[in-house]
Amino acid sequence: MKQFRILAIATAFFIGATGFMTGQSKVAHINKQELIKAMPEYKTAQAEIEKLGKTYETTIQTSIKELETKLKQYDAEAASQTNEENAKRMQEVEGMKQSLGQYQQQAQKDLQEKEFNLLKPIVEKADNAIKAVAKEQGFQYVFDSAMLIMAEGKDLMTDVKAYLKI
């Protein structure tokens, strides 16, 4: 009878452990940033952002050169001008500096907004692809492996790239 009890307890323990193991969540991982950078849409968006940035940079550099030229001219002519004229010129230069600073801030804001608007649909497409592949393969959780110290489980990168045809 004692052996039967031990056998029953061992069997119950085994069944419980097996149930626990099969009840474990299926976990996968993917480096989302690497996936996004591999997407052709990302490369197109980055090229557009860089082009816009260079346009702003060219305009800013031209304005800086104009300001420097005007400063040199006004400095060279300062001795021959009246105090009133020099004060007027200083106000003009200060106005130009303020305008340039405002333009730089607006350019930075426009670039950030453009980047957000271009990347948002790309990130959404990557998220949807990851979700579709994970669901198709029965995964309950997908972690971004860029933030993990140790990534065990299936890496979905190859499958998601195949899903996106990249």
For each feature predicted by the language model, list its residue ranges:
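Bacterial Sec-dependent N-terminal signal peptides
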Residues: M1-K26
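Amphipathic, charged alpha-helical segments and their helix-to-coil junctions
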Residues: Q24-I166
